[in-house]
Amino acid sequence: MADQRNQADKPTTRIPDDEWEAIVANVPLVSVDLVIRHEGGVLLGFRENEPARGEWFVPGGTVFKNETLTDALYRVADEELGVDVTIESRLGTFEHFYDTSDVEGIDSKHYLATAFEVTLDDDNLEMDTQHSQLKVFEPPYEGLHPYVERYLDALD
């Protein structure tokens, strides 16, 4: 299911902080996650922000209104890694429940995350501040965050 960009550079809008707080407090967030096959394993980032701070996790982010899932995936790849990716398959939609949040005064987050298996179009990665390190994990995958393990199970 190789897929290339179909609506690149479509304008999107970020939500103002006060509205974002209300959404996080009351609504599940729609997001995309990138399960990146690379060098015989899967590329993960060491998270510096909530949720999942201090864990090896897949790059990902929320979907903006009027943005397709695939356009969100391409945007996230560019913002978090500085590269283009090719979609190999859609792994499915997964529910994630966290007891932490990046929003002050809100103690949880709920995501409906659609995960995609992707490959990198370029090896020149440029991390953003959400990850302090990038590392390829090879099978057998052990000791990873349970949500990452669910994604890896879906690869097989």
From Swiss-Prot:
Description of the deletion phenotype: Impaired formation of the tetrasaccharide present at 'Asn-532' of S-layer glycoprotein Csg. No effect on 'Asn-47' and 'Asn-117' glycosylation of S-layer glycoprotein Csg.
Instruction: Give residue ranges for domain Nudix hydrolase.
Output: 25-156
Q: Which UniProt keywords apply?
A: Hydrolase, Magnesium, Metal-binding
Has the keyword Protein transport been applied to this entry? no
What is one Pfam family matched by this protein?
Answer: NUDIX
Keyword Hydrolase belongs to the record = yes
Which cofactors does it use? Answer: Mg(2+)
- Its EC number is 3.6.1.-
Annotated PROSITE patterns: NUDIX
Per the Swiss-Prot or TrEMBL annotation, the motif Nudix box is positioned at 61-82
Q: Which GO terms of type biological process are on file?
A: protein glycosylation; S-layer organization
Query: Pathway, per UniProt?
Result: Protein modification; protein glycosylation; Cell surface structure biogenesis; S-layer biogenesis
Q: Where does substrate bind?
A: 14-15, 47
**Example GO molecular function term?**
hydrolase activity
Binding of Mg(2+), residues: 60, 80, 130
Domain of life of the native organism: Archaea
Q: How is the cofactor bound?
A: Binds 1 Mg(2+) ion per subunit.
Q: Which protein family is it in?
A: Belongs to the Nudix hydrolase family.
Q: What does this protein do?
A: Nudix hydrolase involved in N-glycan biosynthetic pathway that takes place under low-salt conditions (1.75 M instead of 3.4 M). Participates in the formation of the tetrasaccharide present at 'Asn-532' of S-layer glycoprotein Csg, consisting of a sulfated hexose, 2 hexoses and rhamnose. Mediates attachment of sugar 3 in the tetrasaccharide.
Matching entries from PANTHER family are given as: GDP-MANNOSE MANNOSYL HYDROLASE
What is the name attached to this protein's record? Low-salt glycan biosynthesis protein Agl8
Please name the source species: Haloferax volcanii (strain ATCC 29605 / DSM 3757 / JCM 8879 / NBRC 14742 / NCIMB 2012 / VKM B-1768 / DS2) (Halobacterium volcanii)
UniProt gene name: agl8
